Amino acid sequence: MMFHFLGTAGLGIALSWLVFTHFLQSSCRCQPWEPCWPSDEQWELLNRSMEFTLVRLQPIASVCYNHSLDHTLCEDVMRMSRDSGWRASQPGALQDWVWESGQSPGDACPLGSQMNGHTQCHQGRIPLYSAMVNSTKHVQEAVMFAKRHDLRLIIRNTGHDLAGRSSSPNALQIHTHRLQDIKFHDNVQLHGFEKSFGPAVSVGAGVMMGDLYARSAQNGYIVVGGDCPTVGVVGGFLQGGGISDFLSLHHGLAVDNVLEFEVVTASVSLPEPDAIQYCGFLTLRQGDIVLANAIRNPDLFWALRGGGGGTFGIVTRATMRVFPDVPAIAAELGVQTSQSHGEYSRSLAAFFTVLQSLNRENVGGQLIITVISEHSIEAKLKMFFLNQTNTADVDQRMQPFVEDMRRIETHVTYESTSLPKLSMNYRQVPDIHTDNDYGVLGSTVAISNDLFNASKGPAYVADGLAQLPTRPGDLLFTSNLGGQVMRNGDLMETSMHPAWRNATQLINFVRPVEPTIEGKAGALQNLTNIHMPLLYAIDPRFRLSYRNVGDPNEKDFQQVYWGQSYARLLQLKRRWDREGLLISKLGVGSEEWDSEGMCRTGRRSLENLAIDTLSSLAHLIHVTYRCIW
């Protein structure tokens, strides 16, 4: 009886302590100046557990400043920093370096021409440590460490992100870029299924688009992927939807074609310890490795198919469908025109008419508009006729459009190119950035099938885009939706905004930005207050944006990114990441945290605290009484 009393009293103390510590830990994550921050010895233990792949991060430009100045290395970094492939491999760099700077004046470590006037290098938004993982076990170790010490955890693959989601100050980064395995399957068999699913490829989290294109071409395949060769295949691109500029018309979104994910979960469970050996000890174990497909963990599979990267777990591998690498004819129609509203609008309407007409014939393409100067714009429309080998046939089909354009514009160009394999169009070599030392910001808006395919749809969209204030260096381009993207709405279920199944074009707007705190702030203000209202006004009742390239200050992100899918996504977020280890800017559940994912905010956090605490208490009661009896 006395033993029972002491056990109950001990349990009460334990429960009280759990509630108290859970409350303390759930408000803000641990910061370097706080006693909770891991000691050097604890960081070294993590390093050993990960086979010495943990590194202490500094911005790549740090070698150019006094405390660690190395002139030769500085020159090398300045030269290599323009190589997108090199940046992808560097955990202390981002592709869009406007997000490397912090929020306070001077909290940056600029490189190149932006160094003028800067005498010190500051950390900015570059995480303090990076787990440069080589295996799923390394990912598990990093997850366990971040959970145990209540650290901000960031997932980075190649650093491509226009909203700053690949970095955060005072964080531990998991750098997935070394997970480079690629395996092709002639007829893939998924876990839990008796049937097979045809040709597919399994891709590690660090594989870049250009590398996958090259390997796929060697095997006679193409994949639904993006245009940039250094974007990671499996990370935010795939989990955010994955749009191919012209192949989505034929094969749907990339996320429509994913068959299975391998995931290290964010939740770290409290295991039931052995009643004899471990009574009195409750230890956290590593994040579980799970498979998610239509049969195994189907709710997680649904969430990962459009719910956004770095949110529900750390994806370490994905298996996707591949398609035959067919021949094609690429036909390019171009003009150089004035920014005069009437002339510009008429040219755009002609381009959109070509897109409208050829999309109905299952021919996809992309319009790219580059602002050359204050008075000059260059526009090129590239259409892809799949399974075609005769340029004369394509030229004949394009001739009426060329003649229509010549009635509007003086400077018109046209050419057609035969591609023995469609993969020849894909860029497989990393981009080399220009010499302007600028980053970029941008956003997107989708155009509905109802508007675009109306009789006056092309003219209406063109007139709306012509209203957009631009400056030299700005870029506007389309991504072709419709076709199989729309048909897939009846064939499969993803967590994408349902309105994607009624979208025919995605308008992308990108602006070069001086990578300073002031430059970023001014550009963000213009993007949110001027450009996005004008873009949304083109199709105001549709109001759909692409989360992978969205306004970093989007206030209504739940609705414009996910719509009616959001409620279920939030429910699954609380199931698979109950304590909010993975918070992505403008991602599912991020409204419960501050802008950097450091501190919980608002009433919902208290509700989560109660749910989490009760769940932990229930498990503690179960384990304790098992030991007592």
Curated annotation (Swiss-Prot):
**Kinase in keyword set:** no
* SUPFAM superfamilies assigned to the protein according to its UniProt record, in alphabetical order: FAD-binding/transporter-associated domain-like
GO molecular function per UniProt: FAD binding; oxidoreductase activity
Q: What class of enzyme is it?
A: oxidoreductase
Q: Which cofactor does it need?
A: FAD
EC number(s) of the enzyme? 1.-.-.-
According to the record, the signal peptide region is 1-30
The pathway to which it is assigned is:
Alkaloid biosynthesis; ergot alkaloid biosynthesis
Start and end residues of each FAD-binding PCMH-type domain? 122-325
Glycosylated sites: 47, 66, 134, 387, 453, 502, 526
Which is one Pfam family of this protein? BBE
What is an annotated GO biological process for this record, any one? Answer: indole alkaloid biosynthetic process
Q: Which UniProt keywords apply?
A: Alkaloid metabolism, FAD, Flavoprotein, Glycoprotein, Oxidoreductase, Signal
- Recorded family membership: Belongs to the oxygen-dependent FAD-linked oxidoreductase family.
What role does this protein play? FAD-linked oxidoreductase; part of the gene cluster that mediates the biosynthesis of isofumigaclavines, fungal ergot alkaloids. The tryptophan dimethylallyltransferase ifgA catalyzes the first step of ergot alkaloid biosynthesis by condensing dimethylallyl diphosphate (DMAP) and tryptophan to form 4-dimethylallyl-L-tryptophan. The second step is catalyzed by the methyltransferase ifgB that methylates 4-dimethylallyl-L-tryptophan in the presence of S-adenosyl-L-methionine, resulting in the formation of N-methyl-dimethylallyl-L-tryptophan.
Name of this chain's protein: FAD-linked oxidoreductase ifgC
The record lists the organism as Penicillium roqueforti (strain FM164)
